Amino acid sequence: MIFPKLLSYSSSDLEMGFIPSDPQHCLVPVTATISPTGSAAGDNFSFLVATPSALAESGKFGWGRGILIVDSFTWAGVERSLNRLLAHAARDTWQDVAQALNKELLWEFDGYQPG
């Protein structure tokens, strides 16, 4: 059984340790690097951390894949949410783990076809 592990996570829009000016009204893109436990290299999975009010104001409508909806943004909350997701994603192969995570997050290799 392959168990996924969170190696790192960050945002291109918000430096780690800082919070948005209004943590209850924000959209923060995040990329998480996730690997099989024991591996130093991982795959990138991206998602948007969004509050309901910011999501409504942005006019972005969709089914919700790749969006973590929170009442208020905190880095600790993002990490907790990721770890909860990973706790339920163990599978027989890394490919199966990544496909399971890809149902909620946006996997960098989604749709990739080797040439």
Model-derived regions: residue spans:
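Short helix/strand-capping turn motifs
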Residues: 1-94
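Short, compact, well-ordered microdomains
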Residues: 80-115
